[in-house]
Amino acid sequence: MDYKNLVAERIKENTELEVDLIEKLIEIPPKKEMGDYAFPCFQLAKTFRKAPNLIAEELKEKINKEGFEKVVTVGPYLNFFVDKTILIKDVLEKVLSEKEKYGSSKVGEGKNVVVEYSSPNIAKPFHIGHLFTTAIGNALYKILSFEGYNCIGINHLGDWGTQFGKLISAYRRWVDEEALEKDAIGELLRIYVKFHEEAEKDPELEKEARLNFKNLEDGSKEETELWNRFKDLSLKEFNKVYDMLGIKFDSLAGESFYSDKMDAVVQEIDDKGLLVDSNGAKVVMLDEYNMPPCMIKKSDGATIYATRDLAAAIYRKKTYDFHKCIYVVGTPQALHFKQVFTTLKLMGHDWADDCKHVGFGLVKLANKKLSTRNGDVVFLEDLLNQSVEETLKIINEKNPNLKNKEDVAKKLGIGAVVFTYLKNNRERDIVFDWKEILSFDGETGPYVEYSYARGKSILRKAGELTGEADYSKLSSKEEFELAKLLGGFNDAIMNAIDKLEPAMVTRYIIEVAKAFNKFYNAHGILNAEDNDVKLARVKLVEATCQVIKNALNLLGIDVVEEM
């Protein structure tokens, strides 16, 4: 039984409000003793022409209370106390019958959602900042897919621009082929940095680089072969990280893919009378929207990011007919996307309202103990490997005889890092601290994983239990609170979709783990007072493990069965 929906249906029977609106208005009371659901009656004041607290009293008398222990008023709120036995039975039976599908729905059926995420720059380090977009995008992809949406994950590679002209010049002069084979990104970064150092002394290098890129744009064989080599070497390195994270994309159409589509976009903007000359550059004026102009072409005739993003959005709409197009890109790019979406609207593309920028914060290091290959850039692959190594050390201290400990360390170590990136509001900065990230206490990935492994250990020890569970035996506060939380999984997912915020699922599963450990510490499970209580509690453990596993899967994190 969906109690939130039941509350909404009962209110609808006595008001003119629609169920969808009522469900949005329903709140969870701040204190458990105030009930399980609360409906604020302010919305009804105009219709009923009474004060909200009087409306609450009137509804309390009229409402059908079947399925609820009681319905009470608290000022202008109508508070519902659910029938605990019915709720526990309904939730656990639903979880245990639906298993890995529990929490899913078909709400997005028939709707395409484009998710652009990760998008590293070719020939540049795949650094720790990139995990923010990669983890958020992957989680949103999985969450939306779980609710029936058809998702298209796009890795919009930074594989075009004048920097490739510079890299070609640098390659021809200074590349060490042996170093390139050993550490492609490191060597490409080294020669790119050297180009900038040398260009300060010799400005002719910049001219040469521009000519190289012009040749690349014109399809010159030599420049194109070098560009393809840079791209192949980079993707080989990037794929090591994607394999560690278990991430695959539906499309790798990056900036270069749109290079032959931009002239048509510029022409369309011009045809609409939007293109204005500004000191030799071509721009779209956005003064009336309190934004600076959106630059379409630089004074030298080169296109920039905005032009490519306009071309990409138009191509994606034509190709995928998306319901939503989500851009998981850092918060500093917020103005850029506002300019792009506004320009699309001015071009007559009303679907621009379906384009959403999902911003995120910065990654900071609590100390400088993370080794770096080049300067201050921390490579993501190194970070993940270090997390696995640190986790293996902890396992060797705590449980040296654990089977498959290397595999467990890999899942736990990588999962702990991903969990950290998804734990809080995405626009908050992350301060990276190994001690906190890998702790088995507190709001961490290992804490949630340990809760799951603890539950699985109980289930292995319990073995096959026969008979039908009597859920009325689960009468304690801890058992009810845990079951009630399990029943809220889909709500957490829908909140994550509504806010495009995976942390709604992460925070939810932390609360589930806390509630499970409270229950575990308060009650005997395998040594319960009788077999009926034991069976019911084992079923509660089984349902909890299923929900934790489902939630972590949505976040792109593997569970460990034992630790």
Curated annotation (Swiss-Prot):
It is found in: Cytoplasm. Monomer. It comes from Clostridium botulinum (strain Langeland / NCTC 10281 / Type F). Keywords: Aminoacyl-tRNA synthetase, ATP-binding, Cytoplasm, Ligase, Nucleotide-binding, Protein biosynthesis. One of its GO terms (molecular function) is ATP binding. It catalyses: tRNA(Arg) + L-arginine + ATP = L-arginyl-tRNA(Arg) + AMP + diphosphate. GO terms for cellular component: cytoplasm. The lineage of its organism: Bacteria, Bacillati, Bacillota, Clostridia, Eubacteriales. Belongs to the class-I aminoacyl-tRNA synthetase family. Coiled coil: none annotated. A motif ('HIGH' region) lies at residues 120-130. The gene is argS. The keyword Aminoacyl-tRNA synthetase applies. GO terms for biological process: arginyl-tRNA aminoacylation. This is Arginine--tRNA ligase. InterPro entries: aa-tRNA-synth_I_CS, Arg-tRNA-ligase, Arg-tRNA-synth_N, Arg-tRNA-synth_N_sf, ArgRS_core, DALR_anticod-bd, Rossmann-like_a/b/a_fold, tRNAsynth_Ia_anticodon-bd. PANTHER family: ARGININE--TRNA LIGASE, CYTOPLASMIC, ARGINYL-TRNA SYNTHETASE. Pfam families: Arg_tRNA_synt_N, DALR_1, tRNA-synt_1d. The keyword Secreted does not apply. HAMAP family: Arg_tRNA_synth. It is an enzyme of class 6 (ligase). Its EC number is 6.1.1.19.
